[in-house]
Each structure stands twice: as structure tokens, then as C-alpha cells.
Design a protein with these regions (language model features):
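Short, small-residue-biased leader/transition segments that mark boundaries at the very start
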Residues: 1-3
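AAA+/SF3 P-loop NTPase mechanochemical coupling elements
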Residues: 21-31, 60-77, 88-97
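Conserved AAA+/SF3 P-loop NTPase catalytic/coupling segment centered on the Walker-B
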Residues: 27-54, 68, 83-92, 104-112
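C-terminal engagement/docking regions of AAA+ P-loop ATPases
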Residues: 164-248
């Protein structure tokens, strides 16, 4: 991760040859941006990157530049070592569509990792998609049919994170500090559509919503001190909600 917000978005550099200031674009001007251990970046860096994610543009000096399409950000953070980190505010975390938890590799996978590192094997990575193909795929995903009953199911799930007592989940009321925002509903719908697309269906079914619910919601639910004291996780809360909310 860059040490300065100017390193991320870019800055104005003085050219002695031309005696003018020229724009030097930062690494954010890419189709795919990897922000490694984002919670170790200072707040100003996080803010610069997340603003770029939201606005799809950055301002350098007096000029505003559109970011390339598609623009995707993958951020990582180490959940174990938290010393010297800068936790992302809830409003910024909410801008990430998904939070995917990566566990230890499986036995065969770890053997492959050892083999590649010991032998010095280089991965032969070949592109399988072009940028314009991803853009076209996104258009198709947005055409996947989302029935009103599925819409209500999505909204009910998100509302249950805010008002669990209204969904016969009174035991969660004191466990949830805050629930999902409207972005949670939007991204749950988009992720369900994407999952249906991957499954080669032109319509969303409840199983699509359930399949992506944990990844969409786990970082959007704030736990109370009582929940943390009880060792309850946001994943467990999502599971309880999915088991309780009526499936269409």
C-alpha cells in the first residue's frame, strides 16, 4: 500500500524542461487495483482510494480525470495482526460490495504452494477476458430478471439486520449495533443477479440470494459489546436471519 494519498491518485510534477507542471497519474488509474493490507494505510490514503471507488474519478490539481472502465478494487487486510493498523470507518467499509473470508489453503493446495516456491516455478498467467467483454457481461447481469417477491425477500433480510425484533429475532436486538444500509440491499440484489448469471440462469431465485448473503452483509453489521462478549459473529447473525426470514 502506498504511503501517501498522492502516491495513490497521482500528483502534479514540475518539468524543468518545459517549465510547467505536468500530471503524474498514480496506480489508481488501472482496471484492477489491489490494495494490500488496506488497514495499514493511513486514513488519508484510505479516503483517497475509497473516494475514487465511489466517484469513479479523481481530481489532480485543477483537473478531474475519469478512471478507466471497468474499475475494480480488491483490498486485503490481516484480521489477526491489528497492531499499527487504521481500521476503516463503517461508511467506507460499506462501499465494498463483498467481504470474502479466505481460510487456510487445503492440503493439496498448500503442497502446490510449497512446490511452486521451492522450485521457483513461475505462474504462466494468460488473460481470458478483455475489458470490453467484462463491460458487456455487466450489462447482461443487469438484465437478469429480479421478481418483486425476490426484491421483498432481499429488503426483508436487510431490514432484519436493522429491526430484528420485527422478524421474531428479539435475541439479536442487543447484539446488533447497526444494520445494513441501503447499499446492502443494492449490492445483495446485484450479487444475487451475478450469481444467477454464473449459474446460467436469466432469473434470480431465493437460493441465489442466500448464496451471497454472508459475503454481502458480514462487513455491514456492527456488533455490540454484548455480542463480542458472547463471541457472536456477524456471520452467525446473518445465518439466524436467513433461517428466520420467510422465503418466497
Amino acid at each position: 500500500m502506498c504511503s501517501s494519498d498522492l502516491d495513490v491518485i497521482g500528483t502534479m510534477v514540475y518539468s524543468q524542461k518545459d517549465e510547467t507542471f505536468q500530471v503524474k497519474r498514480g496506480p489508481v488509474f488501472a482496471n484492477f487495483v489491489l490494495a494490500d493490507e488496506i488497514n495499514r494505510a493511513p486514513a488519508k490514503v484510505q479516503s483517497a482510494l475509497l473516494e475514487a471507488m465511489q466517484e469513479r474519478q479523481v481530481t489532480i490539481g485543477k483537473e478531474t480525470f475519469k478512471l478507466p472502465e471497468p474499475f475494480l478494487v480488491l483490498a486485503t487486510q490481516n484480521p489477526i495482526e491489528q497492531e499499527g493498523t487504521y481500521p476503516l470507518p463503517e461508511a467506507q467499509v460499506d462501499r465494498f460490495m463483498l467481504k470474502v473470508v479466505i481460510d487456510y489453503p487445503k492440503l493439496e493446495e498448500e503442497k502446490l504452494i510449497i512446490r511452486q516456491n521451492i522450485n521457483g516455478d513461475k505462474l504462466n498467467v494468460k488473460p481470458i477476458l478483455k475489458a470490453d467483454e467484462i463491460i458487456e457481461a455487466r450489462k447482461v447481469v443487469r438484465q437478469v430478471y429480479l421478481d418483486e417477491k425476490i426484491e421483498k425477500y432481499i429488503v426483508d433480510i436487510v431490514f432484519a439486520t436493522r429491526y430484528p425484533e420485527k422478524y421474531d429475532l428479539k435475541e439479536l436486538k442487543d447484539m446488533i449495533g447497526f444494520g445494513g444500509s441501503p447499499r446492502a440491499s443494492i449490492n445483495l440484489a446485484l450479487a444475487a443477479r451475478s450469481y444467477a448469471f454464473i449459474k446460467r440462469r436469466g432469473y434470480v431465485i431465493p437460493e441465489d440470494v442466500r448464496a451471497v448473503a454472508h459475503d454481502v452483509l458480514r462487513h455491514r453489521i456492527g456488533l455490540t459489546y454484548e455480542a463480542e462478549a458472547s463471541n457472536m459473529t456477524s456471520d452467525e447473525i446473518v445465518s439466524k436471519i436467513l433461517n428466520k426470514v420467510e422465503v418466497p
